[in-house]
């Protein structure tokens, strides 16, 4: 209220400090929107706009919190590292193609580690962090590529190669994609890890990749596609 009375234009409500890091930059165990009550309390006593991040991970959640009056503006931090086109995709009605931040904190882990190497941070969801100037060459010319396994690596390759103009088929021996993520997401409150697989599947298919399940990558099976390249 004092800040509001001093003619501050807006207040951005966050929480915690370095000593309570997990309440500032939450890991996967925290529920999206868990600290919206903080912004709501501030709004009760000020007449200026209130901004808050509130662990927002979807446009639907952002819109709901605005409608509830929890806050006046939405702040996005890590979601824009995971997908710099987050806002653009919402404007274009392509919300289903957003690569969601899974709250794994690899961005901060890598930045702290790489600070001593004078390099950049990384992201588990966005391999182009720090490599934004690299443009995908559309040089696939329809060449056939067979990818063995629909885990995170295989699906990432499928999406990027499809965007480059390759004819991509992914062979997955199980009934569902995900690989090791299907184990990693099982502990309580680790469900967000599955988002990266869901988002990769959506974007890989939209780019033109085909995924075949219950398919073991035997040599005879692979040869049926006459691939120019095989990734395993």
Regions found by a protein language model. Name each.
Residues 171, 227-232:
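Short hydrophobic core segments
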Residues 11, 147-210, 214:
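Beta1-alpha1 glycine-rich phosphate/pyrophosphate-binding loop at the start
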Residues 46-48, 165-166, 207-209, 225-227:
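Short glycine/proline-enriched coil/turn segments at helix->beta-strand junctions
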Residues 1-148, 152-163, 168, 176:
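Flavin-dependent oxidoreductase catalytic cores
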Residues 212-225:
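A conserved short coil-to-beta-strand element within the FAD-binding core of flavoproteins
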Residues 68, 204, 222-225:
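A short, aliphatic-rich alpha-helical micro-motif
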Residues 39, 87, 201, 219-222:
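Short amphipathic alpha-helical segments and helix-helix/interface helices
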